[in-house]
Amino acid sequence: MHQYQDLLERILSDGAEKTDRTGTGTLSVFGHQMRFNLSAGFPMLTTKRLPLKAIVHELLWFLKGDTNIKYLRDNGVTIWDEWADANGDLGPVYGHQWRSWPAPDGRSIDQIANVVDMIKRNPDSRRLIVSAWNPAEVDKMALPPCHCLFQFYVANGKLSCQLYQRSADVFLGVPFNIASYALLTMMVAQVTGLKPGDFVHSFGDTHLYSNHLEQAKLQLTRAPRALPVMRINPDVKDIFSFRFEDFELVGYDPHPHIKAEVAV
């Protein structure tokens, strides 16, 4: 995954020093794009180990429309703990907006169900979009969505996805986001009878926190290894019916984990 290594190098060489909400400080660039051909392997970072369990369960949690961390905690995933309130609630974050976007007339809009249906009925549509950025509810969210809008595209029997990420924690968050949306693209492709195409990752404020710089430099000393293969249970034909057991990552041989503190 040279694309990710190239991004680390760009930020370290060209990044501007900026302050941020957490008070940590960042090196930041504005505007970047990476493209991953999903037929060339599953884009799971190999220059450090990533936890597949957390990535898959978080995505399934989003697709459930859930915004309480109980499901995550029950499955040993703690990545949202810092932002939850005493009851485990996060407010109307990703899952709520994906599955229950509130309409002015009181209805709830299931954006995921709608986009899957539209891909099947009108694959050439330019409206195959899901948005998590709801200005009316941002202030109620424990953390406003960083990966805030994605669009699907169908051509030659293949499904591609482009994600726009307004704010990108490149060392900790972005590797998760790449794997998560690549997997989502593969899942949607399967349930719509298509092959996976490309995952395109577009960024706004693209940054390394100041307490991640040495870790990023260490990661750049490591050569990327061959990408693994993601196997998905072919019997699942409904986007909301996937379970953790339906996914198998084959041939994942990463370099060791690199510890870094999350900026809250």
From Swiss-Prot:
Q: Name one GO molecular function term.
A: thymidylate synthase activity
Q: Does the keyword Cytoplasm apply?
A: yes
Q: Where does (6R)-5,10-methylene-5,6,7,8-tetrahydrofolate bind?
A: 169, 263
Q: What is its main location?
A: cytoplasm
Q: In which pathway does it act?
A: Pyrimidine metabolism; dTTP biosynthesis
Enzyme class (EC, first level) = transferase
Q: Does the keyword Isomerase apply?
A: no
> Which residues are listed for dUMP binding in this entry?
21, 126-127, 166-169, 177, 207-209
Name the active site residues. Answer: 146
* One GO process term, biological-process aspect: dTMP biosynthetic process
Pfam families per record:
Thymidylat_synt
Q: Which reaction does it catalyse?
A: dUMP + (6R)-5,10-methylene-5,6,7,8-tetrahydrofolate = 7,8-dihydrofolate + dTMP
Q: What is its EC number?
A: 2.1.1.45
Q: Which PANTHER family match?
A: THYMIDYLATE SYNTHASE (PTHR11548:SF9), THYMIDYLATE SYNTHASE 1 (PTHR11548)
Family per similarity comment: Belongs to the thymidylate synthase family. Bacterial-type ThyA subfamily.
The UniProt function text for this chain reads:
Catalyzes the reductive methylation of 2'-deoxyuridine-5'-monophosphate (dUMP) to 2'-deoxythymidine-5'-monophosphate (dTMP) while utilizing 5,10-methylenetetrahydrofolate (mTHF) as the methyl donor and reductant in the reaction, yielding dihydrofolate (DHF) as a by-product. This enzymatic reaction provides an intracellular de novo source of dTMP, an essential precursor for DNA biosynthesis.
Its name, as the record gives it, is Thymidylate synthase
Q: Which organism is it from?
A: Bradyrhizobium diazoefficiens (strain JCM 10833 / BCRC 13528 / IAM 13628 / NBRC 14792 / USDA 110)
Q: Which gene encodes it?
A: thyA
